[in-house]
Amino acid sequence: TLTQCDSSSLQMADASVDNVLLFFLLHEQPEHVRRGTLAEAMRVVRPGGKIVIVDYHKPGPLHPLRLLMTGVFRKLEPYAMDLWENELEAFLPEGVKPAAARKRTWFGGLYQQVVWTR
């Protein structure tokens, strides 16, 4: 089942879903909403379930698009730079951590896929 709703205030029971997918969402959210989104994702996923996050990631210093993307983010994506400056776990509530975490980056580090297991 695919559910569309306010990601920072899910109307779902605790541990009620197998998986959560956050696809290019977090860079669109102010920090307080992003924190709520990740807290809610951790809350609603069953133990052993997965949270899959795909979003921007800070590319290496020699990446040919790094300078361009910095300008794009500053003008058009004001919350995206947070994802360059912090690991995603930094936005989780204090004391909340995934049981396991795996991160892969693509296109020279410009994009990331993070999979958390609860």
Regions found by a protein language model. Give the residues of each.
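Conserved Rossmann-like nucleotide-binding pocket used by diverse enzymes
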Residues: 3, 21, 52
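A short SAM/SAH-binding and catalytic strip from SAM-dependent methyltransferases
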Residues: 18-32
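A short glycine-rich, Lys/Arg-flanked "PGG" loop and its adjoining helix->strand segment in the class I
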Residues: 35-47
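C-terminal alpha-helical "lid/dimerization" subdomain adjacent to the S-adenosyl-L-methionine
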Residues: 35, 52-113
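Active-site beta-strand termini and strand-to-loop segments that position acidic
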Residues: 116-118
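A short acidic, Gly/Pro-enriched loop at the edge of an enzyme's catalytic core
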Residues: 8-20
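Class I SAM-dependent methyltransferase SAM/SAH-binding core
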Residues: 1-9
